[in-house]
Amino acid sequence: MDTQRKYDILEIRDNALKPVYAREILESLPDWFGNKESLEEYVKGVCDLPFWAALDGEKKCLGFFSVRIHYGHTGDIYVCGVRPECHRMGVGKALYGQAERFFLEKGCKYAMVETLSEKADYAPYEKTRLFYNSVGFEPLITLTEMWDENNPCLIMVKPLAL
């Protein structure tokens, strides 16, 4: 375990463990993942995707990132989350750093993420957008037709240095 932080970032290859960690974290974030149908879709979706978890000394999951790659050159943050009590402690940045290293190893030129647009005026997602800005993402476009008009989808992108 890193002596500076109280957790390790581990790649999880066990497809039975990925949904356990994902459910545990996503259920701790009802302001972001309150829609049960979407939550279930994410929990099932992580099984076959690259997945990293932040585990503390007792092997408790503090957060996770699951990603996919489109067209061989665009890394996509499929779903991620960090326990509320661990927000602003570097867990998300450490997890994102691992995901970005993976994207670079796979030859990706860009990273992208879909999140709720500021046009929805929903405070929890303001924190989400600030997080993505802090790791180098920029807004690209808001699509009201992607999810629905009440939940406009903001696509954020980050060019990756190869």
Please report, for each region that a protein language model flagged, where it lies by residue.
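Acetyl-CoA-dependent GNAT
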Residues: 7-78, 83, 96-97, 102, ...
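A short, internal acetyl-CoA/4′-phosphopantetheine-binding micro-motif in the GNAT/acyltransferase core
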Residues: 80-88, 116-119
